[in-house]
Amino acid sequence: MTIKRIALAVATIMMCLQASATEISQTEHLTFYYPNFKSIDLALGKMPDTSDPKVEFCCEAAFTGQLLASFTHSNVADNHVSGGKWYQGYSCRANTGAFIWHPDKWEFMEKKKFLSEKPKCQMAFCQYLLILQGRQTPMWKMMRNNRTRYRALCEKDGRLCLVESKKVVTLEFFIKCLMESHVTNAIYLDMGAGWNYAWYRDAKGEVHEIFPESKKASDYRYRTNWVTFYR
């Protein structure tokens, strides 16, 4: 093989790696993670391992009801879909929306629509809906001034992304920052010590952990479900 062909082969490999990397951008208050994915699923019972080269990004999705020693679908907040199969969770009043993914589309919607229509999809989960079609949804007064590091699954400029606040903020401020960043859809993702652990893969295939200290939190072992982006 000539030097020119070797260089071309290396360049092609690098382009493929770049195409599968999680892209990161930032604003003053937010960090945006854009996974380049081929599919999405809801992992249940056990978080995908960092040794799995097919996983691009993985983080907690729906709320978990109780701190149980073993996994049960009834401990996941509201009905959910994994691998194209529907499962029944516990009814959670705080959940107002749902996210669904099917190979030819994704959609953010109100929970009542999701539960009544049962749309055909490969994966789905319910959570607290923050923004729908460019408009902020009604905010629970009791949550307005809750302070934490927030994370949401969002749609911006026609792309899916995971968005985090850079520091502890109120929910009201977090949503304000999302709106100012022209996020068109956003649904909350479970956070808090233990629940906020996540990881993603870069262009070299190397794993980067988010909140790695949470693996030492007491609640870490009780997590139940993860929105997972696959290469």
Language-model segments: which ranges?
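Hydrophobic h-region of N-terminal signal peptides that target proteins for export
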Residues: 12-19
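Bacterial N-terminal signal peptides that target proteins for export
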Residues: 1-7
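Conserved beta-alpha junction segments in alpha/beta enzyme cores
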Residues: 129-157
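Conserved, well-ordered active-site substructure
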Residues: 71-85, 155, 160-168, 172-181, ...
